[in-house]
């Protein structure tokens, strides 16, 4: 079984300790208490994510290292809860203010999530999916690699070496300031043109103008100077509804909430008493 990804619950979310049946095996003891299998299962089963898709039914289904980890998390939460109770920290004014702020934020988050759920319809999803698919049809994605350096001179020197037959991946590993891609021969991965949140326009425009295996002249961006190489070009795959669900849900949620907040501001007759420049900057 693959190693489980265990979510450490915060002390504030610790549920009350369930009464355990005497037939449960005791898996740990501590001063003033003991831990039974059923308590671990009740506490953690809903929060466990198995990449393999397997279902956890019994405590013994967990690998030994995860059994130990779960027990320690469970007991540590109990011990810390007791320390909190002894400290009287929750009675301080500062804590009460933080608690009230946290409650307000949690309530607002719940409100917004519920609002999105009640206003995001199947038709909206289908319409947005169809629009998304249409926007991808006929588009091309490219696999790019780059070498990033500080100065134009460094970039030109690298370009000259490449023109003389130097290996791009080797130079990227030796010279690129982008350490994340340098360890992979400068490879960034696949990109689409004008896709929000990807790369800066100067980089994208130069990359999409290249042919496969062609290397660019030095390109300047806010990050420095780049030498770009296109490794592959292929059509953008059309995702299924399931594959696109998260992307589309996020887009629709943002639109729904933007309108909701705008309507609230309008109902409240909100007027910002700042100079126009500052007001316009805040809206960006």
UniProtKB/Swiss-Prot annotation:
Keywords: Cell outer membrane, Isomerase, Membrane, Rotamase, Signal. Disulfide bonds: none annotated. It comes from the Bacteria. Residues 1-20 form the signal peptide. It is found in: Cell outer membrane. It catalyses: [protein]-peptidylproline (omega=180) = [protein]-peptidylproline (omega=0). Belongs to the PpiC/parvulin rotamase family. This is Parvulin-like PPIase.
